[in-house]
Amino acid sequence: MGDPREQFAATLFGLYPDFLPTQGLYLDLEGNGSGSENILSFYWPALPGARRFSWMRRSESTDISYAEIRTHIDSIGASRARWIVVYSAGQESPDERERLIGLLGQDLFPGSSWINLLHVTQQSRRIKSSIREHRNVWYARDQVRVRYSLEALEWEFGIERPVNIRSHSYRYRDLDGGCGHMEVLATAQRSMSESATEEEEQSLRDYCEADVKNMFQVAYASEQLLFTRSERRNRRVVRP
């Protein structure tokens, strides 16, 4: 298995053998992780393309409530999601799940399985080696340290973000070591206070969409790499 992406795919479906990428809800939170989140982003592949991404933002004075999220999840049909997919610290049990429970006071998806693509990356020796060798993305405060970030994984799968939705916390090889332009938490604060420019609002939306959409693209490409067309069809057959 020479292609690092193939080992990533084998690791993903080895850890989660029943996982169907088109039936997962891809989720991301932007905030401080202390019981108050600024943005929740969702990507639900069951919907037509233009409607797959949605997001919720808190106001300056009010947190996003359980009732609001429950209504939103029901409205997009994602309450039936079998898997919740994130890219999060926390190994197999992702921090993102605990942050969501901390925000809402209860588990929004009690019957769903959580998949942490960072955990998959950390378990895939070849993809980690490839990320280090390519050095497409590294941590801005440390010229040596290469993080196994979502953006680094995206590069391995041929996904390239525009510079305006690359994180200012990272430096990039194709920018000659320059940083990305997106300061997501600061931009989110300006959005909540209604002081963000129209361009900033659009970049913030595009950044949040990329975070969840690109997780789906990585998972979907992994299934394509690992299984033949007939195998993929058989995986979707409902058995008694």
Which stretches of residues belong to each language-model region?
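Conserved DEDDh/DEDDy metal-dependent 3′-5′ exonuclease domain
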Residues: A50-D174
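Beta-sheet entry/capping signal
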Residues: Q23-G24, R82-V85, E223
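Acidic, Mg2+-coordinating catalytic module of metal-dependent nucleases/exonucleases
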Residues: A152-R239
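N-terminal accessory regions of nucleic-acid-interacting proteins
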Residues: M1-L25
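Short acidic, Gly/Ser-rich segments with clustered Asp/Glu that frequently serve as metal-coordination loops
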Residues: Y26-G35
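Short conserved beta-strand segments at catalytic cores or DNA/RNA-binding microdomains
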Residues: S36-G49
